[in-house]
Amino acid sequence: MQVTSMIIDDFYVNPDSVRNFALSQPFDKKGNFPGARTAAYFTDDIKAAIEHYMPWAGKITNTYEMSGFTGAFQIATAQDRTWIHSDPHNMWAGVCYLTPDAPHSGGTGLFRHKETKEHFGHHNEYDGYDYTKWDLFDIIGNKYNRLVIYRGDLYHASLDYFGNNLENGRLFQTFFFDTEKR
């Protein structure tokens, strides 16, 4: 059986210190994503921890350092909007939720295109803003210090952004990487 997504609760040993570190960083990176991001922050310890939870996939072989997004912290608030998409340029994508007491509904949704029945895509030609064209087949709730890893080509979207500032908005850390095996 092939793994398409996995949930790791209590990922960081000290999530409060990770959150405090994230909040001290400048959120000055804008791009094709809601909200704003920091510079990448992907240490050898983080890499080893992810590899520990994915022994069947082998070592992490590429973290797309040139993109500056692997390990970046991101903030999005209730005013931000997202769309259904995939991240097909990498084998794996992930988010670690870093807002304590966040609404459970502010997690990640996994989608299937209604017309084609596709869960995975190496393109984003479908209208990701038109949620009526998609079936939501799984919801992964937002829980403090939960790491969610899923295949990069799996259609997904953030759900229910919340808050209005850095302290109470949806703070998370992004990951994009390849491994020796899928």
What are these regions (language model features)?
Residues 1-84, 107-108:
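Non-heme Fe(II)/2-oxoglutarate
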Residues 76-182:
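Catalytic core of non-heme Fe(II) oxygenases with the double-stranded beta-helix
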